[in-house]
Amino acid sequence: MKTPTDLTSYIRVLKLASTPTWDEFSKVATIAGLGILLVGFIGFVIFSIMTFVPGGP
């Protein structure tokens, strides 16, 4: 591992990075929230099906 080379590449990435605008942030947050809700809904559906199947928990 070449520490000086790694540090310079990290610094280069940090200089190129910028703070997202409010519009970008809200879009990403909305998509992430919808993804979390979708995964939770799929889990609930699987749990509901397994509850009614004989031999389920």
Curated annotation (Swiss-Prot):
Gene3D superfamilies: Preprotein translocase SecE subunit (1.20.5.820). Essential subunit of the Sec protein translocation channel SecYEG. Clamps together the 2 halves of SecY. May contact the channel plug during translocation. GO terms for biological process: intracellular protein transmembrane transport; protein secretion; protein targeting. It comes from Natronomonas pharaonis (strain ATCC 35678 / DSM 2160 / CIP 103997 / JCM 8858 / NBRC 14720 / NCIMB 2260 / Gabara). One of its GO terms (molecular function) is protein transmembrane transporter activity. The chain crosses the membrane at residues 33-53. It is found in: Cell membrane. Belongs to the SecE/SEC61-gamma family. It comes from the Archaea. Coiled coil: none annotated. Its main location: membrane. This is Protein translocase subunit SecE. Component of the Sec protein translocase complex. Heterotrimer consisting of SecY (alpha), SecG (beta) and SecE (gamma) subunits. The heterotrimers can form oligomers, although 1 heterotrimer is thought to be able to translocate proteins. Interacts with the ribosome. May interact with SecDF, and other proteins may be involved. The keyword Cell membrane applies. InterPro entries: Prot_translocase_SecE_dom_sf, Translocase_Sec61-g, Translocase_SecE/Sec61-g. Keywords: Cell membrane, Membrane, Protein transport, Translocation, Transmembrane, Transmembrane helix, Transport. GO terms for cellular component: plasma membrane. It is a single-pass membrane protein. The gene is secE.
